[in-house]
C-alpha cells in the first residue's frame, strides 16, 4: 500500500473509532502534518456521518471551544492539531479538562521517528507532552499495513474508553506520526473488530449511615440531572441547600435554595442558624467562595462529600468522601418526612437580603450592580457563564434567582484564559444561548476567540466588566504592598477599550455606564442570533471596595 494510502486508511480508522465511542464534534486547526486526519474527518462530515467539524486558526482558543462543546453536549469532543508548537497551545485547556473531568480527546499529528533528534523542521518531543494531565496517552507508530486492523482499533478502544466510558472521565492524548506524502491518499478500510462494551456505570453510593436531622446540603459543581436530584431530595425533607454558582441551582428561586452563602456566613446569626445542622452532605466539589469551605472545615460534625470524580475534591481532608453517581446517591438520601426549619435561618436570610439591597442602592454603578441587573434580564433558558476572578464572585454574591437559568463555570483550574472560546463552544450546543460575564483581562487574554462568535449559530453575548486591570487584587493581600507595587505588579492598568475589537470581528457592540443602559443593551443583544459584545465601564477599585464594605457591614450585624 502506498504511504499516502496508509495515512488515509490509518486516519480513517481513527475517525471511525472516535465516532463509535460517541464523538460527534471534531475541532480542527490548520496544519499540513495533520492533513490526513483533517481530510478523513471532512469526508465523514460531508457524507452525513453525524459528525460536525469546527475550525479555528488558534489552537489555544480551539481547545477551549471544545471544552464549551463538551460542557453543553456532555459528550466527548476531539481536537486535531499539526505538529510542533501547535500541540503545546492545547495545554491550558487540557489542564482544565483534567481538573473538571471533561472528555477531551487530543489528537496531535507528529513527524515520524526518523525526523526526530536530527534538526528536522517542526519536530519536537510530543509523546509525553500532556503526561501529568491526561487519563491515558497512546503514542502510535507511523502507519503500517500490518497494524491497520485489529491492533490499531484495539489500542484506540482501550485509550478512548478512558475519556468516553461510563464513570469518571477526563482528557486523553493520541499522538499520530505520519510520513510524507500526506495528501492524495485513498482509504482502504480494514476489517475492524466490534466496539467493546462500555464500562458499567458507577454504582450508587453506599449508605451514609442514619440521617441525623437537622441536615444541610451543600451543592458544588453539578450537572442539571444531578442538581435536580439534589433539589428533589431537599424539597422532600425541607433541607436547606447552600448553592454554589456551578451547582445549576444558584439562579433558581426555591424555598430550599440559599444563594449568596458567603454573605450569610459573614453574619453571626447566619453562622448560628446553619451551625444547628448535625449532618452536612456536600454534592460535588470546587466551591467558589472562601467562607463556605472554611465554615465546613470548622463546623461540620458529620460531613459527607459525594462526588463522581475519581480524585479527591476535599482540600482540607475533613469530609468522608464517597465516589458515586451523584443523582442516584441524592435520591437514595430522600427522607421519610420533612425536618423542621432551622431556627433563626429565615430571619438571618432576611437581614442579609435587606442589607445587600441597601448597599447596592447607595453605591455607584460597578460590578455588583451590573451583575445583579444582568441576572434580572436573562431570558428563560439562557445560560449565564460566570467568568473567573471577580465576575464569578459577583455572580455568587449578587445574582438574583429568577428563572433557574443554567450557570456555566470553568473552575477546574480557574484560569482567566479561554473563556470567550468556551462560551462560544457552549452556545453551539445550547439553543437558548449564553451570556458570558468576564473581566477586561480575561477578554484581552482571549481576544482571538471573538472570531468564533462571528460564526456562532446561537446567541452568545460577551459582557466585559472593564475596570482597567485586575480588580480581584484589590480584595487580596497584594494591596498591603503599597499603592505603587499594587498598581505596577498586580493590577496592571492598561487603558484599553473593546469597541474596535468588536468592530474587527464584525460584532455588534454596546458601551454601558449605568444599570438602565446595561439592561437595555442586554435585552437587545439576547434577541440577536450570533455573537455580540457589551462593555460595562466600571470605576477601577469601586466594585471590590463595595464588596469589602458589604462584608464589613454584615460582619457587624
UniProtKB/Swiss-Prot annotation:
The entry's keywords: Magnesium, Manganese, Menaquinone biosynthesis, Metal-binding, Thiamine pyrophosphate, Transferase
KW Transferase (keyword) present: yes
Note describing how the cofactor binds: Binds 1 thiamine pyrophosphate per subunit.
EC top class, as a word: transferase
Stored CDD domains: TPP_PYR_MenD, TPP_SHCHC_synthase
Cofactor(s) the protein needs: Mg(2+); Mn(2+); thiamine diphosphate
EC number, UniProt record: 2.2.1.9
Function: Catalyzes the thiamine diphosphate-dependent decarboxylation of 2-oxoglutarate and the subsequent addition of the resulting succinic semialdehyde-thiamine pyrophosphate anion to isochorismate to yield 2-succinyl-5-enolpyruvyl-6-hydroxy-3-cyclohexene-1-carboxylate (SEPHCHC).
Cited PANTHER family: 2-SUCCINYL-5-ENOLPYRUVYL-6-HYDROXY-3-CYCLOHEXENE-1-CARBOXYLATE SYNTHASE, PROTEIN PHYLLO, CHLOROPLASTIC
HAMAP family from the UniProt entry: MenD
The protein's name: 2-succinyl-5-enolpyruvyl-6-hydroxy-3-cyclohexene-1-carboxylate synthase
Amino acid at each position: 500500500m502506498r504511504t499516502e494510502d496508509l495515512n488515509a486508511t490509518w486516519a480513517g480508522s481513527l475517525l471511525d473509532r472516535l465516532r463509535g465511542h460517541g464523538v460527534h464534534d471534531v475541532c480542527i486547526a490548520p496544519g499540513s502534518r495533520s492533513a490526513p486526519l483533517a481530510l478523513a474527518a471532512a469526508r465523514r462530515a460531508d457524507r452525513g456521518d453525524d459528525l460536525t467539524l469546527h475550525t479555528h486558526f488558534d489552537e489555544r482558543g480551539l481547545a477551549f471551544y471544545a471544552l464549551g462543546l463538551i460542557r453543553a453536549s456532555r459528550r466527548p469532543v476531539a481536537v486535531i492539531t499539526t505538529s510542533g508548537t501547535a500541540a503545546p497551545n492545547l495545554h491550558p485547556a487540557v489542564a482544565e479538562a483534567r481538573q473538571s473531568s471533561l472528555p477531551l480527546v487530543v489528537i496531535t499529528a507528529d513527524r515520524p521517528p526518523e525526523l526526530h533528534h536530527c534538526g528536522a523542521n517542526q519536530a519536537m518531543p510530543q509523546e509525553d507532552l500532556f503526561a501529568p494531565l491526561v487519563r491515558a496517552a497512546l503514542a502510535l507508530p507511523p502507519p503500517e499495513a500490518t497494524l491497520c486492523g485489529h491492533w490499531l482499533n484495539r489500542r484506540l478502544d482501550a485509550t478512548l474508553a478512558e475519556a468516553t466510558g461510563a464513570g469518571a472521565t477526563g482528557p486523553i492524548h493520541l499522538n499520530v506520526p505520519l510520513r510524507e506524502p500526506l495528501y492524495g491518499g485513498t482509504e482502504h478500510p480494514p476489517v475492524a473488530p466490534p466496539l467493546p462494551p462500555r464500562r458499567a456505570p458507577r454504582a450508587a453510593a453506599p449508605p451514609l449511615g442514619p440521617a441525623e436531622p437537622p441536615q444541610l446540603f451543600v451543592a458544588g459543581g453539578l450537572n442539571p440531572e444531578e442538581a435536580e436530584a439534589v433539589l428533589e431530595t431537599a424539597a422532600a425533607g425541607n433541607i436547606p441547600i447552600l448553592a454554589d454558582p456551578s451547582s445549576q441551582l444558584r439562579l433558581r428561586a426555591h424555598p430550599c435554595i440559599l444563594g449568596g452563602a458567603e454573605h450569610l456566613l459573614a453574619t453571626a446569626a447566619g453562622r448560628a442558624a446553619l451551625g444547628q445542622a448535625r449532618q452536612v452532605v456536600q454534592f460535588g466539589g470546587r466551591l467558589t467562595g472562601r467562607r463556605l469551605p472554611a465554615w465546613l472545615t470548622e463546623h461540620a460534625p458529620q460531613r459527607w462529600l459525594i462526588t463522581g470524580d475519581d480524585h479527591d475534591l476535599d482540600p482540607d481532608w475533613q469530609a468522608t468522601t464517597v465516589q458515586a453517581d451523584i443523582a442516584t446517591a441524592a435520591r437514595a438520601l430522600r427522607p421519610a418526612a420533612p425536618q423542621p426549619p432551622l431556627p433563626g435561618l429565615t430571619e438571618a436570610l432576611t437581614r442579609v437580603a435587606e442589607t445587600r439591597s441597601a448597599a447596592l442602592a447607595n453605591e455607584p454603578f460597578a460590578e455588583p450592580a451590573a451583575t445583579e441587573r444582568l441576572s434580572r434580564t436573562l431570558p428563560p433558558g439562557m445560560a449565564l457563564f460566570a467568568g473567573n476572578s471577580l465576575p464569578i464572585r459577583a455572580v455568587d454574591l449578587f445574582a438574583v434567582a429568577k428563572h433557574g437559568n443554567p450557570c456555566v463555570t470553568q473552575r477546574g483550574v480557574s484560569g482567566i484564559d479561554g473563556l470567550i472560546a468556551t462560551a462560544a463552544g457552549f452556545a453551539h450546543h445550547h439553543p437558548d444561548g449564553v451570556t458570558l460575564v468576564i473581566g477586561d483581562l480575561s477578554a484581552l487574554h482571549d481576544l482571538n476567540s471573538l472570531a468564533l462568535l462571528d460564526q456562532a449559530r446561537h446567541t452568545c453575548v460577551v459582557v466585559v466588566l472593564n475596570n482597567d486591570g485586575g480588580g480581584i487584587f484589590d480584595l487580596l493581600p497584594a494591596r498591603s504592598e503599597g499603592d505603587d507595587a499594587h498598581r505596577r505588579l498586580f493590577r496592571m492598568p492598561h487603558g484599553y477599550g473593546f469597541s474596535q475589537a468588536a468592530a474587527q470581528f464584525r460584532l455588534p457592540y454596546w458601551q454601558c455606564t449605568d444599570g438602565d443602559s446595561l439592561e437595555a443593551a442586554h435585552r437587545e443583544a439576547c434577541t440577536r442570533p450570533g455573537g455580540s459584545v457589551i462593555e460595562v465601564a466600571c470605576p477601577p477599585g469601586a466594585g471590590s471596595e463595595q464588596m469589602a464594605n458589604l462584608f464589613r457591614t454584615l460582619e457587624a450585624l
